[in-house]
Regions:
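Zn2+-dependent metallopeptidase catalytic core
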Residues: 1-19
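A structural signal for well-ordered alpha-helical segments within the folded catalytic domains
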Residues: 64-72, 122-133
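Long, well-structured alpha-helical subdomains associated
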Residues: 111-121, 130-197
Length: 197
């Protein structure tokens, strides 16, 4: 993932300990997340717990699934980093925020608040899932099965991961011509799909 991120997107990825991620629902649970990407000042920090990533995975080969999870997390970092002043040297952007939340955002604090609300969580997951689906379709012979597995996982998941509408669009959209074009391709799917936030 480090080489892939740098070669295609100029992003630096740091790999952190699988036990450094915390899930925060109603209580804070250490080591409970499957994967998480923090956005650091100029880099992406990936936490990946392979045991948790593979919970519920029923396919024969786990490697493409794990690659897809890592690429999904990279998409989160690429998405949010475009909005951050430390990455862009300009004012705060709103591309990673749900359209209804973006119009209310003028400060970094408001941006961070909007990022924690459900519409923006779904908006961000839609991009990351579309990005992963495109990656699988461009690289994996068993992409159709991986996409079906992702749809099954999302159908039984939490509200923030209700992205099957976008996954369906990504599964049938004409693919980009190269990996560097994958992020704008996923952006276009997220923006054009008639899906509910």
């Amino acid at each position: 993932i480090k080489r892939f991120a740098f070669e295609h997107y100029g992003a630096h990825v740091v790999l952190s300990s699988a036990t450094s991620g915390w899930n925060t629902n109603t209580i804070t649970l250490p080591h409970s997340i499957p994967a998480l990407m923090y956005v650091g000042p100029g880099y992406c920090d990936l936490v990946l717990n392979p045991t948790n990533v593979l919970k519920g995975f029923t396919g024969r080969d786990a490697r493409p699934w794990i690659k897809g999870v890592m690429v999904h997390e990279l998409a989160h970092c690429l998405d949010v980093s475009r909005d951050m002043p430390s990455f862009t040297g300009r004012s705060i952007g709103t591309r990673s925020l749900a359209p209804g939340e973006a119009i209310k955002t003028a400060t970094l604090e408001k941006h961070l608040e909007a990022g924690s609300r459900l519409p923006t969580q779904i908006w961000r997951e839609a991009l990351a899932d579309s990005f992963a689906v495109g990656f699988w379709r461009m690289t994996e012979p068993a992409a159709d099965q991986l996409v079906a597995d992702l749809q099954t996982k999302r159908a039984g998941g939490d509200a923030a991961h209700s992205t099957n509408c976008w996954i369906e669009q990504a599964a049938k959209a004409p693919l980009p011509g190269s990996m560097p074009e994958l992020l704008p391709w996923a952006d276009a799917i997220r923006e054009a799909a008639i899906c509910t936030l």
